[in-house]
Every structure is written in C-alpha cells, then in structure tokens.
Design a protein with these regions (language model features):
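Transmembrane signal-anchor hairpin modules in multi-pass inner-membrane enzymes, especially those
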Residues: 1-79, 110-113, 169-179, 331-335, ...
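Hydrophobic transmembrane alpha-helices and their immediate junctions
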Residues: 8, 57, 63-68, 221-222, ...
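Helix-loop-helix junctions and helix-breaking kinks within/between transmembrane helices
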Residues: 30-38, 84-93, 149-153, 182-216, ...
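Transmembrane alpha-helical segments and their membrane-water interfaces
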Residues: 48-60, 73-129, 162-169, 212, ...
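Alpha-helical transmembrane segments of multi-pass inner-membrane proteins
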Residues: 110-139, 150-215
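A membrane-periplasm/extracellular boundary helix in multi-pass inner-membrane enzymes
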Residues: 134, 212-257, 274-276
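Long extracytoplasmic/lumenal interhelical loops at the membrane interface
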Residues: 255-310
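Transmembrane alpha-helices of multi-pass inner-membrane enzymes
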Residues: 339-352, 358-381
C-alpha cells in the first residue's frame, strides 16, 4: 500500500509540475524566453522518472523484455545519428520524447479520480487564461506580444479539449452540463477563427467530427481504425508530397475565413528539406544547417520532421511503437467514453500536425502524456 501511495504521489507531482510549466510557458513570456531551450531536456527527465516509477526497468533488463530493448535501441540510434551529422542537441529530445511518451503510455496507469483532477487543473488554467489574461493580451490584437496569435489559438483549443474531459465526466451524471460543453465549443471556435488559426480549427473540427458526429464508431471496425492510424502517420508524408507537388505548379486558392492562401510557403519549406534529406536518408539531416525558405528551422509537419531530421530507420522504428500502442488504444476506447474522447483528441492533434509540429513540440508534451494516460486509465473503482 505504501509503495502504491508513493507511486501515485510521484505520478501526480510530476504531471502537475508539467502542467504548471505548460501554463507558465504560454502565459508568462519571460518564463518562455528563460526556459525554452531546456524544455526538451526537462520533459525527457520527467518522462524517464514516470517510466521508472511505473515500470520495473531492472526486471525488464533481466527478463530481456524485447519492447524495452527496442525503445532503448531507438533512443540510442536517435543519439548516434545526430552525432554522425553533427546536429544540434535539442533535436534528440524531439524524437526521443515522442517515442518514449508513446512507449510508456501503457505503463502509466491513473485512476479515474486522478484523471478528473488533472482535467480540472486544465479547466482552471483555461478559465484563468480566457477570463483574465486573454483579454489583456489579445483584446486589441496586439501582434507584438511574444506569444504569436496562431500559438494562442492552438494553446486555447488544445487546453479546452483536455478540460472537456471534466465536463464530459459531469455530463454522464448531469445532462445540463451539455450547455457548458456547447458554450465552450462556441467560444473556442470563435477564438480560432478570430486568430485565423488553421491548426486550431483543424484540431477542433476533427475532434467534433470523430467524437460527436461519428460518435466514435470508427473504432468498431479494425480496418477503418487501422486506415485512420495509417493516414495519421504515413498519410502525413503523403500529404507533404502531394502538397509540395501541387504547390510547385503555381496553382493557388484563397481561404476566406482564414484570409490566407492554401499554398502559403510550406511547399517551399518541405521541398528544401527533401533536397537535403535525399543525401542522408538513413541518418537524417539533423538541425545544424540554415534553411532559406523560412525565417526559422521549422519543418511544419511532425511526421516529416522525424523522417528528415532523424532518418528512415528512426522513423520506421517510431512507427512500430505508434501502431502497436494505437492497437491497444482502440480496445481501451471501446470500454470507456472518456478514453474514447481522449483518443479522438489524439487523432485530431495527429491530423493537425500535417501542417504543424504540435504533436512533437516539447511545450505540448504534457498534453500528449495526459491524453495517453486518460486512454489507459483504470476506470473501474
């Protein structure tokens, strides 16, 4: 009993600490500037602590646990590849954190009460942000604020969907909470459109489609579900290829609600990264280079980032872990509504990361940890 209590205390302390850091990163510009370059390392250490706290590593080594040795080999290869190409240090944590979070997701088992508590923390953060800070930061569309407007919309949408778990829990007992859910969606949708944030809009609309329109029925068919996982991963690369080929023809269309063109520069970014990648397909290109197509080193696609920065071997090994865990997520989502909700959010973030990096960005890592923990939580109490 004491060991169980100790494990729960460590789990909750680490997760709450990560959520607090997540809040400070977005709400306090000075904190973001001070800690940004250490975010990946901090997440990696926290994830290692969670893994050791919930999984007997020494037993896994002694019993020659194949999956444990697989993830260890993957993390080692990530590091070796980056050394070979003389890459920047931070790239290691981008790929390693994502792989480790997905791998450890079936080992960090929270109770329903812990899930609800953490969702309540997200709700408190969301309310504080929307009611108190947001009006002062963006009431006059102050573009000079350190947190860019697109990031503010994605942060708001992502946080809202994690807070939605709390409302969904209460809705199961009290139907009038449906009103609060509708109000939340209206507010977040308006915010996403006002900021002209395509990423936030994609997350919200994909989630609503999967959870409320399809009502999660996609998990009933293994073939459809597997196809969705394939599209969320390998389909992202197909999207990059198609988008780049079409964009290079010069054709374009204007999206009225976002006041942006369909092809707004990503085709050039992705083409440039590919031009480097074809010379180093096994090791990836790393990050020790300057690109000409954008003002910063940003791949703008999570799956493509893992592929071009870390190479084919790392990408394939990462996909093995992703597909294996997603198979288990399906079984979990069949048994519980909150797990299904979290799975739909996870899919939404995967699909949003066709055009951005939010799936593997260190600042959003705690959200990924929480989503996978909600899916794998123990709801029978």
């Amino acid at each position: 009993m004491k060991s169980l209590n100790r494990k729960n205390i460590i789990n909750m302390t680490v997760l709450v600490t990560l959520i607090v850091c997540y809040a400070l990163k977005f709400l306090v510009p000075a904190f973001y500037a001070l800690t940004d370059k250490y975010a990946g390392l901090f997440v990696f250490l926290c994830e290692c602590l969670l893994l050791v706290n919930n999984f007997n590593v020494f037993k896994a080594i002694k019993e020659k646990d194949k999956e444990f040795f697989f993830i260890s080999a993957l993390i080692l290869i990530i590091g070796i590849n980056l050394i070979i190409v003389n890459s920047g240090f931070g790239a290691f944590f981008t790929a390693a954190n994502f792989a480790l979070i997905i791998y450890a997701s079936d080992k960090i088992i929270l109770s329903k009460k812990q899930v609800i508590f953490l969702s309540a923390v997200y709700m408190a953060l969301l309310l504080f942000w929307l009611v108190i800070l947001y009006p002062s930061y963006f009431g006059s569309y102050d573009a000079s604020f350190a947190l860019n407007t697109n990031g503010a919309a994605t942060f708001s949408t992502y946080t809202a969907l994690l807070a939605l778990i709390l409302l969904a829990h209460f809705y199961e007992k009290h139907s009038f909470f449906e009103l609060f859910i509708v109000l939340l969606f209206v507010r977040i949708l308006r915010l996403a459109l006002w900021h002209r944030a395509r990423g936030a809009f994609i997350i919200l609309t994909v989630f609503i489609f999967l959870f409320y329109i399809l009502k999660g029925k996609f998990i009933e068919s293994k073939k459809i579900y597997t196809a969705m996982v394939f599209m969320a991963t390998f389909g992202s690369l197909i999207f990059v290829l198609s988008y780049t080929l079409i964009g290079k023809t010069g054709v374009n269309m204007f999206i009225p609600i976002f006041y942006k063109n369909v092809f707004s520069g990503r085709e050039n970014i992705w083409y440039e990264f590919f031009s480097y990648f074809i010379h180093k397909p096994l090791t990836g290109i790393g990050t020790n280079l300057t690109i000409e197509s954008f003002v910063e080193f940003n791949v703008h696609n999570a799956m493509y980032d893992i592929l071009v920065i870390h190479g084919v071997i790392v990408f394939i090994m990462t996909m093995v872990i992703v597909f294996k865990r997603f198979n288990s997520y399906r079984e979990k989502a069949k048994k519980n509504t909150l797990a299904l909700l979290a799975l739909c959010v996870l899919f939404a973030v995967f699909y949003e990361s066709f055009i951005d990096m939010d799936l593997i960005w260190a600042d959003y890592s705690v959200n990924l940890i929480f989503l996978t923990a909600v899916i794998n939580a123990k709801y029978e109490e």
